[in-house]
Amino acid sequence: MDPIREGEVAHEGDSVYTLNDFTKLEKIGEGTYGVVYKGKNRRTNAMVAMKKIRLESEDEGVPSTAVREISLLKELQHPNVVGLEAVIMQENRLFLIFEFLSFDLKRYMDQLGKDEYLPLETLKSYTFQILQAMCFCHQRRVIHRDLKPQNLLVDNNGAIKLADFGLARAIGIPIRVYTHEVVTLWYRAPEILMGAQRYSMGVDMWSIGCIFAEMATKKPLFQGDSEIDELFRIFRVLGTPTELEWNGVESLPDYKATFPKWRENFLRDKFYDKKTGKHLLDDTAFSLLEGLLIYDPSLRLNAKKALVHPYFDNMDTSKLPAGNYRGELELF
């Protein structure tokens, strides 16, 4: 539990922190961007998550563009976005200090019993809160790009928060994480898988669709082990896209005319529990999912539209961290 040695450079901000202001307690994980430690703010005694960012070119130091971009993320203050409290540079290393939450959505789902599903009201509440956070960030032109259950953190009061916003653009997504585990493709939008150079907020909406489906079934919807396998798993469930439903798909760099032509859509079958004979998503929930998994990114539901989908009509928002926020810019 030794204090970290004095940082030479601290972030600019209201309270200037150095690494000496934090005590490392234990390593809690290895994320997409490097090692994560549980730590303590020695000024406030609050628990924090300390991310030591692994940079591809450590010998060259931290790119100033990355520091600038990351510093902007301190402005993303929303009750459903994990707060970035400080950006600290030490030599050529970068530490990001975040508020601490001990549990992520994946661990929460993993500890449910074998035949136990997420309660329907929790499924709805979590989905709504994820969309609230996404809408807030998208309106500020920040795309997540690497959304998955591991970077959705939950607390004991029914809140869910998005972590690692904007880091994909600031740092880039590595192919592998620290442990040489391949960064998951299961939540990646088809336009990225087919090599689109320019993409939009729609990539996050696709990821939310995949996460919504997984919260309902406890199983990843498209569990590919390579980019082409991921793509074909999507095609097998939704049908292979054509120019008819996705204008421009055949012009994408990695589109191949030789792709197998699956024609049927089997999405509904994924939500049928054979044991109980029940559908895990009702018609309005399924309609929201279909809107999030539209192939053409320009037709895919955006976060603001998703927040007013009929699925959320009877939503009790009184106890949610961001209340009834549905994309009104002036709220935060």
From Swiss-Prot:
The gene is cdk-1. Gene3D superfamilies: Phosphorylase Kinase, domain 1, Transferase(Phosphotransferase) domain 1. One of its GO terms (biological process) is anterior/posterior axis specification, embryo. This is Cyclin-dependent kinase 1. The active site is at 146 (proton acceptor). Phosphorylated. Its EC number is 2.7.11.22, 2.7.11.23. It is found in: Nucleus; Cytoplasm, Cytoskeleton, Microtubule organizing center, Centrosome; Cytoplasm; Chromosome. Belongs to the protein kinase superfamily. CMGC Ser/Thr protein kinase family. CDC2/CDKX subfamily. SUPFAM superfamilies: Protein kinase-like (PK-like). One of its GO terms (molecular function) is protein serine kinase activity.
